[in-house]
UniProtKB/Swiss-Prot annotation:
Region described as Interaction with pAP: spans on this chain: 270-288
Pfam families: Peptidase_S21 (PF00716)
InterPro entries referenced in this protein's UniProt entry, alphabetically: Herpes_virus_sf, Peptidase_S21
Site for Cleavage, residues: A230, S231, A491, S492
Keywords: Host cytoplasm, Host nucleus, Hydrolase, Phosphoprotein, Protease, Serine protease, Viral capsid assembly, Viral release from host cell
Comment on protein domains: Region of interaction between pPR and pAP is called Amino conserved domain (ACD). The region of interaction with major capsid protein is called carboxyl conserved domain (CCD).
MF-aspect GO terms: identical protein binding; serine-type endopeptidase activity
Motif Nuclear localization signal per record, residues: 416-422
Single GO BP term: viral release from host cell
Record organism: Human herpesvirus 6A (strain Uganda-1102) (HHV-6 variant A)
Name of the protein in question: Capsid scaffolding protein
Region annotation Disordered: where it falls in the sequence: 394-431
Length: 528
């Protein structure tokens, strides 16, 4: 079985990390590389029980600190081989044609696309005698910019993926790598499937993982021909029925680029309801003559629908609605009939109209209007309506001060009910509401005064005069000074490990203690 190599940058000199402690100056790297602190162990996500190989070389290149390592654990490779055989994503193969099919390399690239360097903290002066570089890890995503791991069978193939590495630097790396594999102790890899599953679960909850991998890939100048599927999520392709009548989306896009859309005009189709069938037949025949087009998406066999672009649909709809004849209702010779009044024969209606309105309106013309109807009922007199409304406003209604409290005959509150005018204006309602709120506030203040006076009386009878407040919790600075800082810095991202339930309990406990302290201070001030 051929060897498995991994290469990538552990830091990029031209990019500043998000945290100041992750900064790794170039002079420090050159100084530590001269000390000969190589080889280093290669593990998974800084887990010393999951050591899978050794680092074969660290190189100070113009772009950054480059690392070449070899995976030597056969136990770990057996696990990767079994996972790759059951993964549907890896079984489907690579979308990019130049890449040779290699399930093991694809599984490693998808699971551990990041590199992380564990080094000594620069500000720590107590670790002068210990080596600066501790180990290198493959992880889900690195904390430093540009830390992408490229897996492959040959070192030269890995170096060709990086466009930021010059030809002279590639020769330098190939000459400096220790290709002679030494013996590897399989006992160094004591992790099991549960450890790998827990690691993948933690990696899936890292925020902004995919954007970080895409940015790292751009910083390293990686070519498109890589096995890293985490940084290139598949794009859902939605292709229209035809290229002439719709939109077409490109199959693949570069990271950060916009989807290219090609549109064209839709010819106007003349006809009535047969226009849909003719347009569909025309576009289907035109697709056969178009070269280099994306194959059409066939409609499901159980569906009778036809895929039609939006522009073609609206154009056909406009043509169809424009050619339909407009139906104009015929003009009636007779005047409109009011449905709310009953039509009567000529003899009855003429007699009633003549009885009430013959002197004012005279008799109607029988030749023009062959039927008769009642005249409309006169409207309700506005003056009478205004009089009744003003009379209603003068009424007074009994209303208690509180709707929640009930009173019965014989109670003292029953005879003290106030009479208030009925309020119809919004401003008056708002003023009444504010008065009620103010009255409730005054009552609450009076109750608080009574309780405070009762507490004073109780405390005056007790032998202890003052209450000793509880001890306050330590501040953030005191906690930082009490807890020791780690001496080894691991540059791999991990999800937040704060227990939210415990944090909520601590916050509620702190708030309760703070309220007790404020209440005790207020009582002491009132006594003094």
């Amino acid at each position: 079985m051929s060897k498995v190599w991994v290469g990538g940058f552990l830091c990029v000199y031209g990019e500043e990390p998000s945290e100041e402690c992750l900064a790794l100056p170039r002079d420090t790297v050159q100084k530590e590389l001269g000390s000969g602190n190589i080889p280093l162990p290669l593990n998974i996500n800084h887990n010393e029980k999951a050591t899978i190989g050794m680092v074969r070389g660290l190189f100070d290149l113009e772009h950054g600190l480059f690392c070449v390592a070899q995976i030597q654990s056969q136990t770990f490779m057996d696990i990767i081989r079994n996972i790759a055989g059951k993964s549907k994503l890896i079984t489907a193969g690579s979308v990019i044609e130049p890449l040779p099919p290699d399930p093991e390399i694809e599984c490693l690239s998808s699971s551990f696309p990041g590199l992380s360097l564990s080094s000594k903290v620069l500000q720590d002066e107590n670790l002068d005698g210990k080596p600066f570089f501790h180990h290198v890890s493959v992880c889900g995503v690195g904390r430093r910019p540009g830390t992408i791991a490229i897996f492959g069978r040959e070192i030269s193939w890995i170096l060709d993926r990086f466009s930021c590495i010059s030809e002279s630097e590639k020769r330098q790396v190939l000459e400096g790598v220790n290709v002679y594999s030494q013996g590897f102790d399989e006992n160094l890899f004591s992790a099991d499937l549960y450890d790998l599953l827990a690691d993948s679960l933690d990696t899936s909850y890292i925020r902004k993982r995919f954007p970080k991998l895409q940015l790292d890939k751009q910083l390293c100048g990686l070519s498109k021909c890589t096995y890293i599927k985490a940084s290139e999520p598949p794009v859902e392709i939605i292709v229209a029925a035809t290229k002439v009548a719709g939109d077409q989306v490109q199959l693949t896009t570069e990271p950060g680029s916009e989807l290219a859309v090609e549109t064209c005009d839709v010819p106007v189709v003349h006809g009535n309801y047969d226009a849909v069938e003719s347009a569909t037949a025309t576009t289907a025949m035109s697709n056969q003559n178009l070269p280099n087009t994306t194959p059409l998406l066939s409609s499901p066999p159980f569906s009778d629908c036809v895929f039609l672009p939006k522009d073609a649909f609206f154009s056909l709809l406009n043509v169809t609605t424009g050619q339909q004849p407009k139906i104009v209702p015929p003009v009636s010779v007779h005047p409109p009939v009011t449905e709310q009044y009953q039509m009567l024969p000529y003899s009855e209606s003429a007699a009633k109209i003549a009885e009430h309105e013959s002197n004012r309106y005279h008799s109607p013309c029988q030749a023009m209007y062959p039927y008769w109807q009642y005249s409309p009922v006169p409207q309700y007199p506005a003056a009478l309506h205004g009089y009744r409304q003003s009379k209603t406003l003068k009424k007074r209604h009994f209303q208690s001060d509180s709707e929640d409290e009930l009173s019965f005959p014989g109670d003292p509150e029953y005879t003290k009910k106030r009479r208030r005018h009925r309020v119809d204006n919004d401003d008056d309602k708002e003023m009444a509401r504010e008065k009620n709120d103010l009255r409730e506030l005054v009552d609450m203040i009076g109750m608080l005064r009574q309780e405070i006076s009762a507490l004073k009386h109780v405390r005056a009878q007790s032998p202890q005069r003052h209450i000793v407040p509880m001890e306050t919790l330590p501040t953030i600075e005191e906690k930082g000074a009490a807890s020791p800082k780690p001496s080894i810095l691991n540059a791999s991202l991990a999800p937040e490990t704060v227990n939210r339930s415990l944090a909520g309990q601590n916050e509620s406990t702190d708030l309760l203690k703070l309220n007790k302290k404020l209440f005790v201070d207020a009582l002491n001030k009132m006594d003094s």
